[in-house]
Amino acid sequence: MAGSYGAYVLRGDVMNPNYNQTVTLYNCFRAQDNPESRKDIWQRTVLDRCFYKNVMGQVESRDGLKMANAYTVRIPESEKYKPYHEWIKLSPEERAGYFTCSLKDMIVEGECLEEITGATPFTAAELLSRHKPEAFVVTAFSDNTSHLTGKHYRIGG
């Protein structure tokens, strides 16, 4: 089930004008955390008024330097956010009203209507492949909502 939320900065802070992108966040309810299923379950959420940046740069590898994309997404603080350990405790119906962010989740730039079912051609890997380079797997996450201003969730990949 997909949700769509306009993420706003709360408590009267002024909206950052760079937060003008839409992203689709795919949250993975991992099989090891779900006693009712032996497979990952994916939830799609469309988030408006976010910051999205995709930069091509050099990274070191075993074989020397290579070119790779580096992604940064910032989502303004939202009442619809739950930390993963709280999100997984919600019923499926309640979970549909919230989003979370954790490693191995996926982000696609823009509004993506595809669902991840786990069956070909709707696997996470296939969705990622279809939408590259505008899609990535989350490899870094920080909750920056304790800041005095500009409260947000930062996602990297």
List each language-model region with its residue ranges.
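Polar/acidic, low-complexity leader/linker segments enriched in S/T/G and N/D
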Residues: A2-E36
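Short, conserved turn/kink motifs that form compact alpha/beta structural patches or helix kinks used as
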Residues: A2-Y8, K39-G156
